[in-house]
Amino acid sequence: MVEGRAVSREAAREIYGVIVREDGSLDADGTKRERAGQRAARVRKDGSVKTLAGKVIAKVTENLDVRKENGSLHCACAKCGADLGPIRDNYKEHCVMEEREITAANPNIGDWKRYIDDKPVFRQFYCPGCGALVENEVARADDPVLRDIELQLH
């Protein structure tokens, strides 16, 4: 990724928690520490995160499950089971959101004003329970959070 300039060394650390040494090699121990620190910083601090113990009935994405809890269907973090709301809701509204400059998504973007009028942003959505990255989106700064998944399960 870094060699192909898909992400810079800085973005690898900031976005993915991957530590790339000056010589281009990966620092596995440093990456483990960085990711643990990032996840700890992203969790909801008010203690209001409910963990679901119900059966996983669907794997929506690598990071998002649907669980049946007390007869109702909820989105949940695939890593820790944190409740991300009923399936009728936008799961992103139950995540911790961080909005970054668009260049954080890709170092090759350059000056966005050359291509579009409205300021774009790079949004990242984290599990409020464990801090794992759940989803990314690129949007205009004034756009509402994208509802990228609609589920109809019974």
Q: Which sequence ranges carry the predicted segments?
A:
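Intrinsic disorder at enzyme termini
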Residues: 1-68
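A broad, structural surface signal
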Residues: 3, 10-14, 78, 82, ...
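Short Asp/Glu-rich motifs
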Residues: 20-21, 96, 146
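Short, surface-exposed, charge-dense and proline/glycine-enriched linear segments
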Residues: 39-49, 116-128
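Short, flexible, mixed-charge glycine/proline-rich loop motifs
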Residues: 60-76, 114-121
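Short, structured motif recognition centered on aromatic/hydrophobic residues
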Residues: 72-91, 122-126, 134
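Short recognition patches in nucleic-acid-associated and regulatory proteins
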Residues: 82-120, 140-141, 152
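Short, compact, well-ordered microdomains
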Residues: 118-154
